[in-house]
C-alpha cells in the first residue's frame, strides 16, 4: 500500500467535500476513535446494535442495526457511502465486507480480510500458528460437547475453553478436570457473541506475564508503509476481562525483540493501515502469540495518559495516511470502573474524590445501562514509576461508584 491508496485530502464535515468514516461498533473504544477523527475534521457515522451507545453520543450521525445482518449492513453502507469503514467489534457480517471490498465499492480498515480473519479466534489462531509459524498454546476446536470432551482430553488439564467469538472474557472457563467440561460448554454457549456453537480449547501456558503490543502500520514520508511499536503494555485479566493495565512493562531485551518479530509477522500478513492490539504471553525470553485485534485495544486505554499520542489518535492518523508518533511520555496506569448494580438510569458518585489523587484522570463511558461487572469507565494515573501509577489508578477507580435509579 502506498499514498495512492490513501486519502489525499481531508474535507469539511457535513459538506460536499466531507471525508466520511463509518464505525461499526460504537462502544467506549469507538467513542475515543470518533473524537480523534473529529479533531482531524472527519465526518463520522457511528453504528451499533443498541441506541445511545457511547460512540453515538459524539458522532455526526448514528444508526442502530444488527451488524451481523448482511442485507441491513450493505443497505446502510450504500446509503452513507463512507470513504472508510472501521470495524470496532468482531460481531459483524465480515463476509459481506470482503465481498464489497473485492468489488471495489468500499475500503475497510485495515482490510476486509483482516476483519474476517480476526472476527473469531479460529481464523487468527490458524493463521498465526499454522501459516506463520508463531508459537502459541496447544489448541483444539469443538462444535459440540462430545468434541469438547475429546479436545480437553487431548490437550490435558488445566485448560481454557472460550467461544470462538466473544469479548471481555464472556463465556470463558478454566477447567481443572473432566468434571468441568459440561459446565464450560454451557458457559461458552451463553457467552458467545453469536450463536455459532463453536469453541476453542487452549492448553495452559506457564507464563510470567502477558502484554499488549500496540503495533501501528502507517505511511511514512517515503510513501511506504512502516511498522511502529508502542512500549509494551502490561495488564491483569480476570476470567479474560481486562481489569488494569500499565505502560511500560519491563521486558527482557530478547523477549521484546521476539515480541516485535511476532507482531510484525502477523500484522504484515493482515495488511492495511491502522493500529493493532497484539496480545502475547511472556516468560523470560520466551514469547507466545495469543490474539490480535485490528483496532484499538481495551488495555491500551492507558495510552490516554502515557503516550504523546493515544492509541485512538494513532489509529485515526494512520488510517488517514498521516504520520504517527508512538513515543512514551510518562509511566502510567489504568484501572477499570465497574458497574455494581443493574439499572438504566446511571449516575456516578465519588468523581471529585478520585481526582484528588495525584496525577489521576477519569473517563466515564456514558453507557446507558449498568450491570454488575460492566465496564462503565476507567481511571488513569501518571507517575514517576509504574508501581505508583498502578496504585493511584486503582485507588481512583475504587472511589467512583456508578449508582442506578431504576
From Swiss-Prot:
Enzyme class: ligase
GO MF annotation, one: phosphoribosylglycinamide formyltransferase 2 activity
Annotated binding of ATP, by residue: 121, 162, 167-172, 202-205, 210
Gene3D superfamilies: 3.40.50.20, ATP-grasp fold, A domain (3.30.1490.20), ATP-grasp fold, B domain (3.30.470.20)
Record field: catalytic activity: N(1)-(5-phospho-beta-D-ribosyl)glycinamide + formate + ATP = N(2)-formyl-N(1)-(5-phospho-beta-D-ribosyl)glycinamide + ADP + phosphate + H(+)
Keywords (A to Z) from UniProt: ATP-binding, Ligase, Magnesium, Metal-binding, Nucleotide-binding, Purine biosynthesis
Gene Ontology biological process terms, A to Z: 'de novo' IMP biosynthetic process
Binding positions (N(1)-(5-phospho-beta-D-ribosyl)glycinamide): 28-29, 88, 298, 367, 374-375
Domain spans labelled ATP-grasp: 126-320
Keyword Metal-binding: yes
Keyword RNA-binding: no
NCBIfam families, per database record: PRK09288.1, purT
The protein's name in its UniProt record: Formate-dependent phosphoribosylglycinamide formyltransferase
Amino acid at each position: 500500500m502506498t499514498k495512492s491508496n490513501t486519502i489525499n485530502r481531508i474535507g469539511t464535515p457535513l459538506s460536499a467535500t466531507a471525508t466520511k468514516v463509518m464505525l461499526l461498533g460504537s462502544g467506549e473504544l469507538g467513542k475515543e476513535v470518533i473524537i480523534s477523527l473529529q479533531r482531524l475534521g472527519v465526518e463520522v457515522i457511528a453504528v451499533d446494535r443498541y441506541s445511545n451507545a457511547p460512540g453515538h453520543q459524539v458522532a455526526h450521525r448514528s444508526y442502530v442495526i444488527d451488524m451481523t445482518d448482511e442485507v441491513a449492513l450493505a443497505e446502510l453502507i450504500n446509503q452513507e457511502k463512507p470513504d472508510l469503514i472501521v470495524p470496532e467489534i468482531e460481531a459483524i457480517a465480515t463476509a459481506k465486507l470482503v465481498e464489497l471490498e473485492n468489488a471495489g465499492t468500499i475500503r475497510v480498515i485495515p482490510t476486509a480480510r483482516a476483519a474476517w480473519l480476526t472476527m473469531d479466534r479460529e481464523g487468527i489462531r490458524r493463521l498465526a500458528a499454522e501459516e506463520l509459524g508463531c508459537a502459541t498454546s496447544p489448541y483444539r476446536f469443538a462444535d459440540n460437547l462430545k468434541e469438547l470432551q475429546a479436545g480437553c482430553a487431548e490437550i490435558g488439564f488445566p485448560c481454557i475453553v472460550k467461544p470462538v467469538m466473544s469479548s471481555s472474557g464472556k463465556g470463558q472457563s478454566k477447567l481443572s478436570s473432566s468434571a468441568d467440561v459440561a459446565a464450560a460448554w454451557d458457559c461458552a454457549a451463553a457467552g458467545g457473541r453469536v450463536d455459532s456453537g463453536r469453541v476453542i480449547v487452549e492448553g495452559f501456558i506457564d507464563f510470567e506475564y502477558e502484554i499488549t503490543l500496540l503495533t501501528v502500520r502507517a505511511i511514512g514520508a517515503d510513501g511506504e508503509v512502516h511498522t511502529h511499536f508502542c512500549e509494551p503494555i502490561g495488564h491483569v485479566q480476570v476470567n479474560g476481562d481486562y481489569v488494569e493495565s500499565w505502560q511500560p512493562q519491563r521486558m527482557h531485551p530478547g523477549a521484546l525483540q521476539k515480541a516485535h518479530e511476532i507482531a510484525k509477522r502477523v500484522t504484515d500478513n493482515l495488511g492495511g493501515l491502522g493500529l493493532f492490539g497484539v496480545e502475547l504471553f511472556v516468560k523470560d525470553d520466551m514469547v507466545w502469540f495469543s490474539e490480535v485485534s485490528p483496532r484499538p485495544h481495551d488495555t491500551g486505554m492507558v495510552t490516554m495518559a502515557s503516550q504523546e499520542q493515544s492509541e485512538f489518535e494513532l489509529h485515526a492518523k494512520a488510517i488517514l495516511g498521516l504520520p504517527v508518533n508512538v513515543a512514551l511520555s510518562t509511566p502510567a496506569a489504568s484501572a477499570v470502573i465497574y458497574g455494581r448494580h443493574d439499572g438504566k438510569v446511571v449516575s456516578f458518585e465519588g468523581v471529585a474524590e478520585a481526582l484528588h489523587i495525584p496525577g489521576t484522570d477519569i473517563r466515564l463511558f456514558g453507557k446507558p445501562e449498568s450491570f454488575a461487572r460492566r465496564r462503565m469507565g476507567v481511571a488513569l494515573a501518571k507517575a514517576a514509576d509504574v508501581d505508583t501509577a498502578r496504585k493511584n489508578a486503582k485507588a481512583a477507580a475504587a472511589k467512583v461508584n456508578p449508582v442506578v435509579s431504576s
